[in-house]
């Protein structure tokens, strides 16, 4: 009995290690509130590292998005990965503003592939029609906690993006300059494979991370059941 109790204690401590020595930080812009917590970093690889970002709203414009990136979320790999979800949603609302947001947080070589794919997937309508299996305007919601195809991709609030370390260790960039690529999983119920790989780059002497590659965030997800109600 004692052995079982000790084993359960070890398992619990192991599960909590991903957030060890990590405090939740909060940042506000007007009435919008953002938080982040996690131990994911480019400094060293930790297979138990995790990250979580919450937000009450999608940034209203480029100015808010830029401030959020430069002052808060862009300073961590998980914060930057979560901002890719926001940028995708902004692109769905306004192509030009969304393009600016995508260019801001992405490494240059990744920009065109993201925009090309989103333009194709989002089509011209503001919201996806019922049971649309291709023009998936709801893609940004597919990685938000609580959102599933069955509930019309309606996430819990505040919106939450959960992440954890990939099985792939950090890699030094050998082409297109220098830096270290952090591989992480963004969790989402929109696919059979719920671990969506995102590559985030940290370059020397640069305070902010950049999205290096992220096709798993905009590949075909499960078809919505019902009509998507959008995000606020």
Report residues per predicted region.
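N-terminal secretory signal peptides that target proteins for export/translocation
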Residues: 1-2
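Cleaved targeting-peptide boundary
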Residues: 21-29
């Amino acid at each position: 009995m004692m052995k079982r109790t000790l084993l359960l204690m070890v398992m619990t401590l192991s599960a909590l290690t991903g957030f060890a020595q990590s405090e939740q930080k909060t940042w506000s812009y007007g009435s919008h509130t953002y938080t982040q917590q996690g131990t994911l970093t480019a400094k060293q690889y930790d297979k138990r590292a995790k990250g979580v970002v919450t937000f009450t709203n999608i940034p209203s414009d480029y100015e808010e998005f830029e401030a959020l990136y430069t002052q808060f979320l862009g300073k961590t790999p998980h914060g930057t990965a979560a901002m890719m979800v926001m940028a995708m949603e902004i692109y769905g609302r306004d192509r030009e503003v969304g393009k600016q947001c995508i260019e801001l947080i992405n490494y240059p070589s990744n920009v065109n592939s993201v925009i090309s794919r989103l333009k194709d997937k989002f089509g011209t309508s503001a919201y996806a029609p019922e049971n649309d299996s291709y023009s998936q305007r709801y893609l940004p919601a597919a990685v938000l906690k609580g959102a599933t195809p069955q509930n019309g991709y309606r996430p819990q609030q505040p919106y939450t993006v959960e992440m954890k370390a990939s099985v792939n260790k950090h890699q030094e960039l050998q082409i297109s300059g220098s830096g270290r690529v952090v591989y992480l999983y963004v969790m989402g119920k929109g696919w059979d494979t719920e671990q969506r790989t995102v590559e985030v780059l940290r370059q020397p002497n640069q305070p902010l991370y950049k999205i290096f590659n992220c096709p798993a965030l905009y590949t075909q997800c499960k078809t919505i059941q019902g009509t998507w109600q959008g995000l606020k």
